Amino acid sequence: PWQFERDDQAVAEWSVDNQGPDGQPRLRVVVTRQGRVAWNPQFSYAGLKLVGGEPYTLQFLARSDEPREFGINAMMAHDPWEQFGFNATVKTDRQWQSHRYTFIPNKGDANARISFTGLKPGAYELAAVSLRPGGIVGLEPGQSLEAESVAIVRRSAVNLTKAARQDWIDFLYSTEQDYWLGMYRFIKDELKVRPIVSGTQLSYSPMHIQASLDYIDAHSYWHHPAFPGRPWDSRDWYVQNAALVNTPGGTLSGLAVRRVAGMAYTVSEYNHPAPIQYAAEGFPMIAAFGAFQGWDGIFSFAYSHNTDFEPGKISSFFDIKGDTSRMVHMPACAAMFLRGDVAPAREALSVAVTPEAERATLYKTLSAWEITADNYGLDPRLSLLHAVAMAKEGRPADLPAAPAKDAVQFVSDTKQIYWDVSQKDAGYFIANTPRSKLFTGFIRGRTFKLGDIALRFGKTRLDWATVSLVAVDGEGFDKPGRLLVAATGQVENQGMTIEDLGSGRITVRDKWGDAPMLCEGIEAELLLPVAAERVALYPLDEAGNRREAAPVAAHNGKARIVLAPRHKTVWYEIQVRE
């Protein structure tokens, strides 16, 4: 049946009559306002059974009130809504025109749909729509190898034969391989460059090509800004205001399955973009997780895009220079990852991705993004328990059982990392080591155990917080030395008005607000495993200098540390004496 999709922003109407060519039924759609995402509104016909590898021909007549274009595709009519390799752009004008597309689905499905999508404001009409098995695919009229008239293959081409797809991939692969290895030899052999060299981030290029260089690199963003209209439009964008702690693995597992066993691995771009209200979780979580996985480098993208290094406010999606909540936990990130407080996994798992298996994936998908361990049999959630990677050679591995689909608690094989989603939409993440500890997540009235330290909260604005603790120069939290505590919640600029777009989407458009930045003071209590008389608590100023000491109380033989908004700070020094 035909379906017409509109979200709460789209304004569009549709009707069916007999005013098509020669009195045929005509579908007319008038769009007044586009939806919140680029593909909305759209209409589709679902319930189709498609057989993978078999040709189908889609035909229809179309016209519009002005020269316009829209997209068509074949995809699942159900979760996970995957497309089948057919995706084309239809151009229309005021005259009825016939359109014919022959395509071969890359997989079969019993409930597929043909979608007409991305309708911008205007009037569109369709008639004589049909989808039939069969059709001729291959060279277009007038094309031949002898005449050298075969056009460059476009990714959006829908009439590629299997041989054409494979020839095209083989050509791209050899061209790219020659480029990367040629540049590598030039840099190393002719220029005599001594540092290690990589090509580009994995997934921009096949794994085996990039693994021929010195190390593997990858990028990832938790809910990168989306631009429904014009790319990078400063007034038309949104981010999903979601917390990673509610999605076990998330971007972290997505990075883990791109690692190559036996090679150095860096993540040279990572961030949880502003104005996501939970962005403080990002760098501490990847620091702990990356150390557990045994990664070699993690880079924030970015500290600054310009020379205004101390703006005193959040200035953009990615620049962390003015964001207290993302900066104040960096000492803990350094301790967990660089100092090595978080221990590497005890067990490393890998799946073999041979050159032949990689090439088969490229033939099928035309995408290097599909060359990840999870597409070769490794459940990405295993990365929450053990180190994971792709092996360049080898036989299929015997992998341990994956966590149950309904699993809600994940404990690393070192027992130092704990991820809990036992309460709906109230996940939390803990890293617990002898010299550093991290909590980030939703509170819900719970008390959290960080080893022999108990952490409980008062009321916070989001019922969420991030707290990091670092033994700066002592051997642990019950030993003499200085401890650094950072506690953050909601942050925003003055005059920053967050606009709720629905479905978890938020924006501030181009109204980022002004300095100084406003930070929530977290109300929390820590119970340290030392006598209160051995402990001094100092709220710190913005430069990290001690302010007047705050009282420390005794509670059942332990030191009771109280963090409170009255201290007007997000970090504290704790001195543990002999």
Kindly give the residue locations of the regions a language model identified:
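Extracellular and organelle-lumenal recognition/adhesion modules and their flexible linkers in secreted
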Residues: 1-154
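Exposed aromatic-hydrophobic patches
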Residues: 59, 98-104, 525-528, 559-564
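Conserved, mostly hydrophobic/aromatic
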Residues: 60, 187, 216, 290, ...
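Short, solvent-exposed loop/turn and secondary-structure capping segments
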Residues: 71-73, 128, 139-142, 209-210, ...
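Glycoside hydrolase catalytic-domain groove-lining segments
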Residues: 146-153, 160, 167, 174, ...
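Substrate-binding cleft of secreted/luminal carbohydrate-active enzymes
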Residues: 220, 275-313
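Long, low-hydrophobicity ectodomains and other hydrophilic envelope-associated domains
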Residues: 334-335, 340-539, 556
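C-terminal beta-strand-rich structural cap/linker in extracellular carbohydrate-active enzymes
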Residues: 557-578
